[in-house]
């Protein structure tokens, strides 16, 4: 009660946010007459003026975070004038002037928030305001779209404004090479899809040279259709993977027995739940449970012993996955089979997702079920979730027509506030109440009757369905009724934009899956733009442009115009375009009046989606920019949402109402119940995404550390100091802690193992080197061994030269790190698979996952130090004649160094290849020797080969700065976590350099 009174007095928080921006809108409006007087050259010169202001603001500021703050303050100062400049450029170049509400949308985006704008309110044009403003900083602005078509279209369309104002525009699409990508990212504003941006980030962190990387730092990002990308896509991580050597026979073997299994159900008897049959499917949680009888039958069918035995665990997992593939994954619903390949269908948009694969053997199980070629399981080489990728940006914002229902998730995961932008004109769409039928069949016949009725009046109709299967079922009914219509689903997605653009024409009936052409406006009377393109192509008045040509020369030549049609780029003369476009514009204007008289676009929903957002998106296709329109949902009590999430309530309702066949009901009670079911599913899906993020956050800290170290190595980190002053002492401390404990007398130390480990890690034999260890204390032993090892390293560096040594240090460190990281990702996958079972032992799986993954990561980094040091100390030197040369173990005058060629064993990417030892001096016969193998040239070839293999396997399946190197030496004594830090700060080691280590 008090809340509603306060709202009436002060307005909602959203209204207050918008109200605070109105004075700036007035300020921009006041600048308009002055800006209008400027010539094109003077308007363009404003860009250089703004850039000079920003450069002055960051002068003398070295700290990166402080620089960012200074830039943001400068941009805030420039915003009114910069927005006025963009508004004028839009009017001159595109003949489109930004409305006041669009200026508000632009300010919200600049502030790093989400702007919710209704369909048809011009989100694409709104983005030009913050894009231009933030691009002035010269740090790069990324605009993320849901597909390549929209990225190309928006870059070409809005790029005219940016180019007019002296900025550059780039587009990232699937088929570009690295050089083209680098050029696109170097532009002031870069358009592309979320997948391309994410994969480029992962690929950059697999490169061996900074100049090969394509992306810049992550400064500012605007995500179009932000709900689709940051919410719907968030459950699927980006994965770059490579094939393993596992066979696919097991999938065929398991698939054969599934038809012999009987699906049962869960029966409640009091408090007890009884499972019947061989397995039970839980559609609500998308899981299956195999009964004891089912496991016995499976054991017989497979001809194995106890399925629970450790040697059969893998088989057990494949059986459960195969049952899921057969019972929960339906053809033409979750996937389609096209050209002998299983392609996933996006559950939210209905679009095909070629190249993306389900993980955990599920995709292979579906391939076995469909009898197509089964691809081997892949091993993860690099991975990141969209949540963690987009959190890399210093500033993130987004725009969509439907985000308010997910406000809590945007705030919790991304710290993004949603601001609902007022519409430019009042909304005239009529939202009719839902009608509910008893069965699916009754519902579809009623929908067909309604379409036929509306079609008599020539009113355009857009029908939304939840799957390919259901869109084709309705199509068959309409064919029998003689109603002409167009079907748009994942099977015909190539024509998506074209079909949706014409859905507002007189008498048009369009059946669409949930994609409903997001990103393409439905204009009443038709889309003159598309009609002009069709005519130009039909009459041969436009030529095709290759992707490479389009990437190298993104802008059309003088007097020419470029456009996109069905995913391809074409070019025609400006004169041809103007003439043809004018003709179609006139006919469209005439037809529009007829459509308005018929009532505008009518939206029919045939089923409620799990997410209220998707329903709102469908409704939002009608009534754009104050046009009339209407919407209604037709439902049945057999719909998935009702059947799975409100089954008991539905059966009770049927008995109470005694519904008759073909008679619909309209009830607020049913609508409320449906909304509650949707909210329950949204909550469940949010928990699933949050669960994924909690686990990926653990991995993210490790990824930041590894990628941070990689970036430091590529940027010229002093790896020599890191190796000699940190890694070598760490390894020595480990050896002495294990075989020469401080509390033991020297007589009890394991001298044989100490000697063996020193030879194994460093090729150093203290007996051959003449070091008398008999009377040395633990501390003296450590210092003496370290001193000699350091001199050996410096002698080797002197022998081959500083620059070659730095190069080989970097190459070996990167190779070892990449190999171990790849293995670590595989181990983390295995850990995640089994960690859920810890719950049965009253342990929190997430806490156990954090603890064990930290131990695994620590072990990996220790192995990294050991392998790096071993390779560098055991490198062979080969002379011009190809014969091994003896490497000096003591420093010599610099002019005595011969020009040797370095030879070494390639650093293994799997961490298991044999390690060569130093050629001279040879170790004593008592210690087994290891043979050298190939030259550094071979190492480089091997590195490059493996990198190219890994990058070529990049596909869809689903940095941080790093810490500074610790320079404190730990030789002889190991510093405890609670001991005072040796640096002399007075802090505990774990709170000082121990935290960095």
Swiss-Prot record:
Ranges of compositional bias, category Basic residues = 987-997
* Spans through the membrane: none
Q: Provide the GO MF annotations for this entry.
A: ATP binding; metal ion binding; protein-exporting ATPase activity
Task: Provide the residue positions that the database annotates as binding Zn(2+).
Answer: 981, 983, 992-993
Q: Which UniProt keywords apply?
A: ATP-binding, Cell inner membrane, Cell membrane, Cytoplasm, Membrane, Metal-binding, Nucleotide-binding, Protein transport, Translocase, Translocation, Transport, Zinc
Give membrane topology per the record.
Peripheral membrane protein
Q: Could you give the cofactor binding note from the entry?
A: May bind 1 zinc ion per subunit.
Write out the similarity annotation. Belongs to the SecA family.
Protein name per its UniProtKB record: Protein translocase subunit SecA
Q: What is the lineage of its organism?
A: Bacteria, Pseudomonadati, Acidobacteriota, Terriglobia, Terriglobales
**Gene that specifies this protein:** secA
